[in-house]
């Protein structure tokens, strides 16, 4: 499984980050016919400075949920993030995912589950590969805690 995943990760090299969408504490990164949906703790760095994190969503004005730090920070820094190409992509032994862009931006998505005894593994991130309709006809690689699941094209 890990070898197959690494082959698919290699196909991300050179892809341009076209857009980012925020959904509560989830970040969705679009790379043309490929995407990353990050549901675990995710942060975006540039030159060793944190630009935005999924936890920033929790800092809000308590009146309008659109007034939160995640969306504010993304609006401030989006021009530094999108439009750049992937130079390198790494997967740690515990399924932390690191994407390095050609302008010094790093996208980090961390596996957030420890050993589970009573709960279940939550989806950490999902890679969608190879289709314009990414939800329907794509190869999907899903990290759930320490487990990786691979789904071939539907």
Residue ranges and their predicted role:
Residues 1-154:
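Surface-exposed, interaction-prone regions used to assemble/regulate multi-protein complexes
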